[in-house]
From Swiss-Prot:
Organism: Lactobacillus delbrueckii subsp. bulgaricus (strain ATCC 11842 / DSM 20081 / BCRC 10696 / JCM 1002 / NBRC 13953 / NCIMB 11778 / NCTC 12712 / WDCM 00102 / Lb 14)
Bilayer-spanning residue ranges: none
Coiled-coil parts of chain: none
Protein name listed in UniProt: Small ribosomal subunit protein uS13
Complex formation: Part of the 30S ribosomal subunit. Forms a loose heterodimer with protein S19. Forms two bridges to the 50S subunit in the 70S ribosome.
Region feature Disordered, mapped onto this chain: 92-116
GO molecular function: rRNA binding; structural constituent of ribosome; tRNA binding
PANTHER family on file: 30S RIBOSOMAL PROTEIN S13/40S RIBOSOMAL PROTEIN S18, SMALL RIBOSOMAL SUBUNIT PROTEIN US13M
UniProt lineage: Bacteria, Bacillati, Bacillota, Bacilli, Lactobacillales
Gene Ontology cellular component terms for the protein in this record: cytosol; small ribosomal subunit
NCBIfam families, sorted: uS13_bact
Function summary: Located at the top of the head of the 30S subunit, it contacts several helices of the 16S rRNA. In the 70S ribosome it contacts the 23S rRNA (bridge B1a) and protein L5 of the 50S subunit (bridge B1b), connecting the 2 subunits; these bridges are implicated in subunit movement. Contacts the tRNAs in the A and P-sites.
Keywords attached to this entry: Ribonucleoprotein, Ribosomal protein, RNA-binding, rRNA-binding, tRNA-binding
The keyword NADP belongs to this UniProt entry's keyword annotation: no
């Protein structure tokens, strides 16, 4: 089982799909990583040679993924909350941040309906 960026990749999936199991890597980025590493997109992760795994690890290390990316996103939200911007206030109150209506919808963000 290939382990890249602290994530065990599924063995029976194509490497392009398996790379998307890493937080911060989507399908397009996975294709770019495979091309840069010189690995065919059709190869299964169980069939990777150790050299190919090392090349993929080196390419993935160039991106901000997993813990570093999660930390950066949470720090960005914390910064918005600390400076008291409109977006920070919306985060603090648990309301939609990007201008969506809240009269009828936004149940996911607001939580379960409170009975009066």
């Amino acid at each position: 089982m290939a382990r890249i960026a602290g994530v065990d990749l599924p063995r029976d999936k194509r490497i392009v799909i398996a790379l998307t199991y890493i937080y911060g890597i989507g399908e397009h980025t996975a294709q770019e990583i495979c091309a840069a590493a010189g690995v065919s997109e059709d190869v299964r992760s169980k069939d990777l040679t150790p050299e190919q795994q090392e090349k993929l690890r080196a390419e993935v290390d160039k991106y901000r993924v997993e813990g570093d990316l999660r930390r950066e996103v949470s720090m960005n939200i914390k910064r918005l909350v600390d400076i008291g911007s409109y977006r920070g206030i919306r985060h603090r109150r648990g309301l939609p941040v990007r201008g969506q209506n809240t009269k009828n919808n936004a149940r996911t963000r607001k939580g379960a309906k409170r009975s009066r």
